[in-house]
């Protein structure tokens, strides 16, 4: 009997999902992206070689895996072709192993232009988007005016829709944001220069998935970003534009919630966040700088430095609630090597003095929130690359156990380095 497993971030993204997806893909037939776009940077280190995937599922590096892009993903033709070119230059067969839902909304140049214009206009109050047009593309989807992959099959109808949409966007870009308009003919020509390649990969993703389940093969769903960036459940408005939570598997791939057998939440042994928004345990001292330096905390897509802080059990408890998380994979434990003491946030003190154990929903409700910490002893031993659980320092084992107690979910996988071999699988999601 095959298993269906979802892997998702349980913090603010950048938890190390790409490595874990790649690690587990030797067990599966299909790897599926179900939300987000090329704003997701999944970094893989295999035999010392670094690969960053932004749009194509991480399973593409395994020859026996078919990769699917579900309807919940916003697809940039330009980004797709660039990523395909990079992979094919390395000898990886993409075109025969990548299938795309025809219901995917397209990201086009006017979405990118609008993204940049809005962030520039907001100034210091900007959301902190990646500037890749993700939000505006999702806006068009909800407004029911967006162009989709299916529209590539009729160039004349596509051109008519494109003209109407560009009239709307260019009016705003020129008259409100005072920037250059997007050229209609260039946009049309650029899209249709690659349309045949994309059309050749179109498939009924939902039917493929349900056939695979009937056949008893393993399926892995690859989430992007993190739970606390979810459009509905994150620190709104400092969120992404898609559902980064387990529910996105149903809406973004047509695979119902009862069909998921296991949800693996990825957590760092500490916390990071890119961009603006609440971050209760953020460190502004030497400890934060040390974590950032040792953890190489820079965005895979943007290169922006990540904000760093202590592990926030309150936020992760919220992720457990929202996603029905079965087990965790903890990454970057080795980054905490050498700290004399470590802190875990166990509760929040609200501005009115109330002590709460669950995270607020809206960003405004985080204002004035103070972390309540529990201090634990650190360890001086080196844990980098350790692959036997019993070989870890006792203080590290105690730290992991305490986090398990606070969030109510076991750590089933432990990562002590960037390479796929630097991992301990304590309980296999496809066997559990």
Swiss-Prot record:
Residues bound to substrate: 300-306
Coiled coil: none
Protein's GO biological process: 'de novo' AMP biosynthetic process; IMP metabolic process
Listed EC numbers: 6.3.4.4
Entries under PROSITE patterns matching the protein: ADENYLOSUCCIN_SYN_1, ADENYLOSUCCIN_SYN_2
Entry binding sites for IMP: 14-17, 39-42, 130, 144, 225, 240, 304
UniProt main location, coarse: cytoplasm
Signal peptide location: none
Catalytic center residues: 14, 42
Places the protein is found: Cytoplasm
Binding locations of Mg(2+): 14, 41
Pathway terms, separated by semicolons: Purine metabolism; AMP biosynthesis via de novo pathway; AMP from IMP: step 1/2
GO molecular function: adenylosuccinate synthase activity; GTP binding; magnesium ion binding
Residues binding GTP: 13-19, 41-43, 306, 332-334, 415-417
InterPro entries, A to Z: Adenylosuccin_syn_GTP-bd, Adenylosuccin_syn_Lys_AS, Adenylosuccinate_synth_dom1, Adenylosuccinate_synth_dom2, Adenylosuccinate_synth_dom3, Adenylosuccinate_synthetase, P-loop_NTPase
Reaction equations catalysed: IMP + L-aspartate + GTP = N(6)-(1,2-dicarboxyethyl)-AMP + GDP + phosphate + 2 H(+)
Organism domain of life: Bacteria
Cofactor(s) the protein requires to work: Mg(2+)
Cofactor remark: Binds 1 Mg(2+) ion per subunit.
Role according to the record: Plays an important role in the de novo pathway of purine nucleotide biosynthesis. Catalyzes the first committed step in the biosynthesis of AMP from IMP.
Family as reported in the entry's similarity comment: Belongs to the adenylosuccinate synthetase family.
Oligomer status and interactors: Homodimer.
Descriptive protein name: Adenylosuccinate synthetase
